[in-house]
A protein has these predicted regions:
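Macromolecular interaction modules
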Residues: 1-129
Length: 129
Protein backbone atom coordinates (compact mmCIF):
# COMPACT_ATOMS: atom_id res chain seq x y z
CA UNK A 1 0.00 0.00 0.00
CA UNK A 2 1.28 3.48 -0.88
CA UNK A 3 0.02 6.57 0.95
CA UNK A 4 0.60 10.15 -0.15
CA UNK A 5 -0.31 13.28 1.81
CA UNK A 6 -0.71 16.75 0.30
CA UNK A 7 -0.81 19.88 2.50
CA UNK A 8 -1.87 23.29 1.24
CA UNK A 9 -3.28 26.72 1.99
CA UNK A 10 -6.40 28.15 0.42
CA UNK A 11 -6.18 31.08 -1.95
CA UNK A 12 -5.96 34.31 0.06
CA UNK A 13 -8.42 36.08 -2.23
CA UNK A 14 -11.21 33.56 -1.55
CA UNK A 15 -13.38 33.10 1.52
CA UNK A 16 -12.18 30.00 3.41
CA UNK A 17 -15.69 28.60 3.83
CA UNK A 18 -16.36 29.01 0.10
CA UNK A 19 -13.14 27.13 -0.66
CA UNK A 20 -14.11 24.34 1.75
CA UNK A 21 -17.45 24.03 -0.05
CA UNK A 22 -15.73 23.97 -3.47
CA UNK A 23 -13.19 21.41 -2.22
CA UNK A 24 -15.86 19.14 -0.75
CA UNK A 25 -18.48 19.40 -3.50
CA UNK A 26 -16.63 20.16 -6.74
CA UNK A 27 -12.93 19.33 -6.48
CA UNK A 28 -13.71 15.98 -4.86
CA UNK A 29 -15.92 14.96 -7.79
CA UNK A 30 -12.91 15.41 -10.08
CA UNK A 31 -10.63 13.61 -7.61
CA UNK A 32 -12.90 10.58 -7.41
CA UNK A 33 -12.66 10.06 -11.17
CA UNK A 34 -9.11 8.83 -10.48
CA UNK A 35 -9.95 5.15 -10.14
CA UNK A 36 -6.39 4.23 -9.13
CA UNK A 37 -7.00 5.84 -5.74
CA UNK A 38 -8.15 3.30 -3.17
CA UNK A 39 -8.85 5.91 -0.51
CA UNK A 40 -9.23 9.68 -0.71
CA UNK A 41 -9.58 11.54 2.60
CA UNK A 42 -10.00 15.31 2.87
CA UNK A 43 -8.91 16.86 6.17
CA UNK A 44 -10.33 20.37 6.58
CA UNK A 45 -8.38 22.31 9.23
CA UNK A 46 -10.94 24.41 11.09
CA UNK A 47 -8.84 25.92 13.85
CA UNK A 48 -6.10 25.44 16.39
CA UNK A 49 -6.74 23.13 19.32
CA UNK A 50 -6.22 25.97 21.80
CA UNK A 51 -4.35 29.26 22.20
CA UNK A 52 -1.14 27.47 23.14
CA UNK A 53 -1.13 25.65 19.80
CA UNK A 54 -2.31 28.59 17.69
CA UNK A 55 1.17 30.06 17.24
CA UNK A 56 1.19 32.46 14.30
CA UNK A 57 -1.93 30.82 12.88
CA UNK A 58 -2.55 27.55 11.16
CA UNK A 59 0.27 26.65 8.79
CA UNK A 60 -2.11 24.96 6.35
CA UNK A 61 -5.82 25.02 5.63
CA UNK A 62 -6.10 21.36 4.75
CA UNK A 63 -4.52 18.13 3.76
CA UNK A 64 -5.49 15.19 1.62
CA UNK A 65 -4.59 11.55 2.17
CA UNK A 66 -4.50 9.47 -1.01
CA UNK A 67 -3.96 5.70 -0.93
CA UNK A 68 -2.84 3.49 -3.82
CA UNK A 69 -2.39 -0.27 -4.17
CA UNK A 70 1.30 0.13 -5.02
CA UNK A 71 3.84 2.49 -6.55
CA UNK A 72 2.82 1.41 -10.08
CA UNK A 73 -0.80 2.41 -9.40
CA UNK A 74 0.44 5.76 -8.06
CA UNK A 75 2.57 6.36 -11.17
CA UNK A 76 -0.27 5.36 -13.49
CA UNK A 77 -2.66 7.72 -11.71
CA UNK A 78 -0.18 10.61 -11.83
CA UNK A 79 0.14 10.15 -15.62
CA UNK A 80 -3.61 9.97 -16.25
CA UNK A 81 -5.83 12.64 -17.84
CA UNK A 82 -8.04 12.40 -14.73
CA UNK A 83 -5.13 13.49 -12.51
CA UNK A 84 -4.28 16.28 -14.95
CA UNK A 85 -7.88 17.51 -14.63
CA UNK A 86 -7.51 17.46 -10.84
CA UNK A 87 -4.28 19.46 -11.04
CA UNK A 88 -5.90 21.94 -13.44
CA UNK A 89 -8.78 22.48 -10.98
CA UNK A 90 -6.50 23.04 -7.96
CA UNK A 91 -5.85 26.75 -8.56
CA UNK A 92 -9.60 27.44 -8.35
CA UNK A 93 -9.32 27.19 -4.57
CA UNK A 94 -5.77 26.39 -3.55
CA UNK A 95 -2.64 28.49 -3.26
CA UNK A 96 -0.53 26.23 -5.44
CA UNK A 97 2.70 27.83 -4.19
CA UNK A 98 1.94 26.36 -0.75
CA UNK A 99 1.31 22.81 -1.97
CA UNK A 100 3.52 20.17 -0.36
CA UNK A 101 3.21 16.47 -0.97
CA UNK A 102 5.05 13.36 0.01
CA UNK A 103 4.97 9.63 0.52
CA UNK A 104 4.31 8.68 4.13
CA UNK A 105 4.55 5.54 6.18
CA UNK A 106 1.82 5.38 8.79
CA UNK A 107 2.26 3.54 12.06
CA UNK A 108 -1.16 2.89 13.61
CA UNK A 109 -0.66 2.87 17.36
CA UNK A 110 -4.34 2.57 18.22
CA UNK A 111 -7.41 2.04 16.08
CA UNK A 112 -10.36 0.94 18.16
CA UNK A 113 -13.02 0.06 15.64
CA UNK A 114 -16.56 -1.24 15.70
CA UNK A 115 -17.19 -4.56 13.93
CA UNK A 116 -18.10 -2.70 10.73
CA UNK A 117 -14.83 -0.73 10.76
CA UNK A 118 -16.16 2.54 12.15
CA UNK A 119 -13.84 4.10 14.73
CA UNK A 120 -15.24 3.66 18.20
CA UNK A 121 -14.27 3.81 21.82
CA UNK A 122 -14.48 1.01 24.36
CA UNK A 123 -17.71 2.56 25.64
CA UNK A 124 -19.19 2.64 22.13
CA UNK A 125 -18.33 -1.05 21.67
CA UNK A 126 -20.40 -1.97 24.73
CA UNK A 127 -23.41 -0.23 23.16
CA UNK A 128 -22.92 -2.03 19.82
CA UNK A 129 -22.60 -5.56 21.26
Amino acid sequence: MVKVIFLFRFRADRDAEDVRTWWLNEHSVIALKNLGMLRYVQNHFIGAIDAEHAGAGMGYDGCVEVWFEDRAAYEQTMASPEWKALEDDGPNGLDMTSLMGGFVMGHVMRWDAAPDGRPSTTTDRAQIA
